[in-house]
Swiss-Prot record:
Gene that specifies this protein: lnt
One Gene Ontology cellular component annotation held by this UniProt entry: plasma membrane
TM regions (residue ranges): 12-32, 33-53, 58-78, 93-113, 122-142, 168-188, 193-213, 484-504
HAMAP family: Lnt (MF_01148)
Location (main, coarse): membrane
EC number: 2.3.1.269
Origin species: Pasteurella multocida (strain Pm70)
PROSITE patterns tied to this protein: CN_HYDROLASE (PS50263)
Domain CN hydrolase: 232-479
Descriptive protein name: Apolipoprotein N-acyltransferase
Location within or outside the cell: Cell inner membrane
Function description: Catalyzes the phospholipid dependent N-acylation of the N-terminal cysteine of apolipoprotein, the last step in lipoprotein maturation.
GO molecular function: N-acyltransferase activity
GO annotation terms (biological process): lipoprotein biosynthetic process
Length: 520
């Protein structure tokens, strides 16, 4: 009986560590930005994953993931409840279901560690990279809350231009494993100082790599290609945005914001689907804007909803107005259409089966089709803008296919009003900052209710509009030329390193087996 109670006490303690460390992992991300919490959280995950009892290890890793994702993506319930018509209880239940699914990946991480009795420090980031790849790929993927994003303001941030956020995440797990090993050794008597020194050298190596990258000049600013850009933040409430009677008020708001800056700035940028009406249905409005913008010498970039009747597609698009080389028309080639759509938000999988089940599967504008994966950059004032709409900015590898050496800026437009005053928009902004650092390109981010910002090529916010205010934000943005290693090679380097480490471990295990195999 005493043995059973002791065992239960140990199991409960392990579960507590899992839940606690999962929760504090969220504090590493915006808006909290305590980047050191990423290492504390992963230390907890490694601890529970290496628990002697396999079943406890698996369930503990699942609880870690459940706690981490439940608190980290709780903002999903806002759109489900407020705009999907579901009750508060149902919306939170759906968040738990999503979190439980995402928790399967940390559980898989623990399973692989238990299955192959992993003790090698190098294998922890390799396995984590594999499970994170699956999370970002299966069922269209949901690569939200990768720990690499949390390091945007840390000393390890400059690994991003070399390896991307996947690589930064790899090194965060590696450093966490090194710290775990270091703490384990320090608690053992007599201490193995050679192991301590080896661990410290590994930490120095990762830090040195980041320091080297911070000094490297992968890109350079082109001062004579700068642009004076104005962001128009309409602050249209999401519950009013799609009401037909509110359309004219929305048109008035953006007409006013545009008029204030016509002729005074190079470019005015409006957010994703700025006007809640088909672009096709208000052609006189757009033709009028085209004429006024062209006369004033200011170009307008705007998110629209476009019906491509030739291809029979409803597209989430970005267009330009006032461009003399690409005069506006419905058939203009100077258009970007969103490729990666959000399941249930922009399209409904198994539509004929799910839509009849309830309003939660009938969010406004959830019937879009995809644009092409690779598209030409938008040409604005003879500058090249590689575009990403809303969720697409979190997909570094997709954006990499469209960011070229002669790309001047990255443009992202969004409507984060779907998520209210939750932490979701801040996490979204943090990922946009990482894209700037990865590619060495300034990011211009225009949103409906915030957070509208200008981000420099180092991933730093240089100008920011207040959230939930109808306003404009103007800033001179300097273009950059050149490419970072990540822009050229993508995730190839970090996947190659993972494969190399995996082969080295396999080869080492084979050698040990041969050496200690009894001879007949």
């Amino acid at each position: 009986m005493l043995h059973y109670l002791k065992k239960m006490k140990k199991k409960i303690f392990t579960y507590f560590i899992a839940i606690f460390s999962g929760i504090i992992g969220v504090l590493a991300f915006s808006p909290f930005d305590y980047w050191g919490c990423a290492y504390l959280s992963l230390l907890g995950l490694i601890f529970v994953a290496k628990t002697a009892e396999k079943k406890t290890a698996l369930w503990s890793a699942f609880l870690w993931g459940l706690a981490f994702f439940t608190f980290g993506i709780n903002w999903v319930h806002v759109s489900i409840h407020q705009f999907g018509g579901a009750s508060v209880v149902v919306s939170y239940v759906l968040v738990l279901v999503l979190a439980a699914y995402l928790a399967l990946y940390p559980m898989l991480f623990a399973y692989l560690i238990q299955r192959f009795q992993i003790s090698s420090l190098a294998m922890f980031p390799v396995i984590w990279t594999f499970t994170e790849f699956l999370r970002g790929w299966l069922f269209t993927g949901f690569p939200w809350l990768q720990f690499g994003y949390s390091q945007i303001d840390s000393p390890f941030a400059h690994l991003a231009p070399m390896f991307g956020v996947t690589g930064v995440t790899f090194f965060v797990m590696w450093v966490s494993a090194v710290i775990f090993n270091l703490l384990s050794v320090l608690l053992i008597k007599p201490r193995k100082w050679n192991v301590v020194i080896a661990n410290l050298l590994l930490l120095t190596l990762v830090g040195g790599l980041s320091a080297y990258s911070s000094k490297a000049e992968y890109v350079r600013k082109i001062e004579d290609r700068d642009l004076l850009v104005t962001l128009a933040q309409g602050n249209i409430e999401q519950n009013l945005k799609w009401e037909p009677e509110y359309l004219y008020q929305t048109l008035d708001i953006y007409h006013k914001l545009i008029s204030q800056h016509l002729g005074k700035t190079d470019v005015i940028i409006l957010p994703e689907s700025a006007l809640p009406v088909l672009e096709n249905h208000i052609q006189p409005f757009f033709q009028g804007l085209q004429a006024h913008a062209q006369q004033a010498g200011t170009e307008i970039v705007m998110g629209t909803i476009y019906q491509d009747k030739t291809a029979n597609k409803l597209l989430n698009s970005i267009i330009t107005l006032g461009n003399t080389d690409f005069p506006y028309s419905l058939e203009t080639t100077n258009r970007y259409s969103k490729h990666h759509l959000v399941p249930f938000g922009e399209y409904v999988p198994l539509e004929t089966l799910l839509r009849p089940l309830g309003s939660v599967f009938n969010l406004p504008m959830s019937a879009f089709q995809s644009g092409d994966e690779i598209q030409s950059p938008l040409v604005v004032k003879n500058r090249q803008l590689s575009a990403a709409i809303c969720y697409e900015i979190i997909l570094g590898e997709q954006l990499r296919k469209n960011v070229k050496q002669d790309t001047d800026f990255i443009l992202t437009v969004s409507n984060d009003a779907w998520f209210g005053d939750s932490i979701g928009p801040w996490q979204h902004l943090q990922m946009a900052r990482m894209r700037a650092l990865e590619f060495g390109k300034p990011v211009i981010r225009a949103t409906n209710t915030g957070i509208s910002v200008f981000i420099d090529e180092q991933g730093k916010i240089v100008a920011q509009a207040p959230q939930f205010i109808e306003t404009t934000l103007t800033h001179k943005v300097a273009a950059t030329e050149g490419q970072t290693p990540y822009a050229v090679f993508g995730n190839t380097a970090i996947y190659g390193l993972s494969l190399l480490l995996l082969l080295m471990r396999g080869f080492g295990a084979l050698i040990r087996r041969r050496l200690f195999m009894p001879r007949l």
